[in-house]
């Protein structure tokens, strides 16, 4: 496998897994309260990574504060927001807002570095988010609450901070040791409310399997792959895995839930994939003179390229 192919796999596979996560969360909510879903997926994720010997590789003592931050900002806090949010907003809007994840990651990276991303990357982010919006339009309704939207936005801001923290930690220690410890921190933080909810849940086979898949896949494997991608190619490029989430959710909605898909949704899915390709390879747009655009932004905002 070439380096470029491996990098694409690091982006596509988490998107495929997370695209199915909303189905697993919805199934889990049939058996347990939202805080129980959060604790269950995090605890299963921690146990999954415990099976890997590399998880126990020592990490620098100075990095423990950052790892704890990842446990809070990447895991405990945002994963607590989504189950509550899904009770107040439509799946279409949830998918659209998740498509904005790379924008939040890029914004946080720009604030930390005092530097805007390259023009081609900015264009790709805009295209990808535009695709997510187009996909969601047919499913938007007036039933979405401001409270649910705020929960999702807070989760995305948290992701934006966490991915930028995780990159240097992964480069120094490796993704599995960092995420295993971060999941341990998140398990401890979510246990006081989550464990009683799990113990008092009305479990049947379907939600139990859903939580196992959500924890092992979406909370362990996908997070490790994304942390690896952040270390290899930067937080902003790693975050474009989010552009695949609404595409996968659309496909699963048709196959599993037999939902009707509009032409507009299919167009949006194609736009999402184009945006991901542009961010991964900004040279696709070299003929559009993004450097000149960057110079204008530099003069007007005080950032540098």
Question: What positions do the PLM features span?
Answer:
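Juxtamembrane helix-entry segments on the extracytoplasmic side of multipass membrane proteins
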Residues: 3-8, 30-39, 59-65, 137-158, ...
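Helix-helix packing/entry segments at the starts of transmembrane helices
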Residues: 39-40, 75, 94-100, 163-187, ...
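Transmembrane alpha-helices of multi-pass small-molecule transport proteins
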Residues: 30-77, 102-109, 157-165, 179-198, ...
């Amino acid at each position: 496998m070439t380096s470029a192919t491996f990098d694409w796999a690091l982006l596509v596979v988490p998107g495929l897994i997370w695209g199915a996560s909303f189905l697993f969360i919805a199934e889990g909510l049939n058996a347990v309260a939202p805080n129980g879903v959060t604790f269950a997926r995090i605890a299963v994720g921690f146990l999954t990574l415990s099976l890997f010997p590399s998880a126990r590789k020592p990490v620098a003592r100075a990095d423990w504060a950052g790892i704890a931050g990842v446990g809070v900002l990447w895991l405990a806090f945002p994963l607590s927001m989504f189950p509550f949010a899904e009770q107040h907003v439509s799946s279409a809007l949830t998918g659209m807002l998740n498509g904005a994840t790379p924008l939040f990651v890029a914004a946080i990276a720009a604030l930390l570095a005092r530097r805007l991303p390259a023009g081609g990357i900015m264009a790709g982010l805009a295209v990808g988010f535009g695709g997510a919006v187009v996909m969601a339009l047919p499913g938007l309704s007036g039933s979405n609450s401001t409270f649910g939207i705020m929960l999702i936005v807070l989760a995305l801001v948290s992701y934006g901070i966490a991915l930028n923290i995780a990159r240097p930690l992964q480069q120094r220690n490796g993704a599995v040791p960092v995420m295993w410890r971060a999941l341990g921190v998140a398990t401890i933080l979510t246990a006081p409310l989550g464990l009683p909810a799990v113990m008092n849940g009305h479990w049947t086979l379907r939600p139990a399997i859903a939580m196992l898949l959500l924890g092992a896949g979406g909370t362990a494997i996908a997070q490790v792959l994304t942390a690896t991608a952040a270390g290899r190619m930067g937080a902003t490029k790693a975050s474009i895995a989010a552009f695949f989430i609404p595409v996968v959710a659309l496909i699963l909605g048709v196959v599993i839930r037999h939902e009707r898909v509009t032409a507009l949704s299919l167009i949006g899915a194609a736009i999402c994939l184009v945006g991901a390709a542009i961010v991964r390879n900004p040279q696709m747009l070299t003929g559009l003179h993004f450097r000149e655009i960057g110079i204008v932004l530099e003069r007007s905002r005080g950032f540098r390229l």
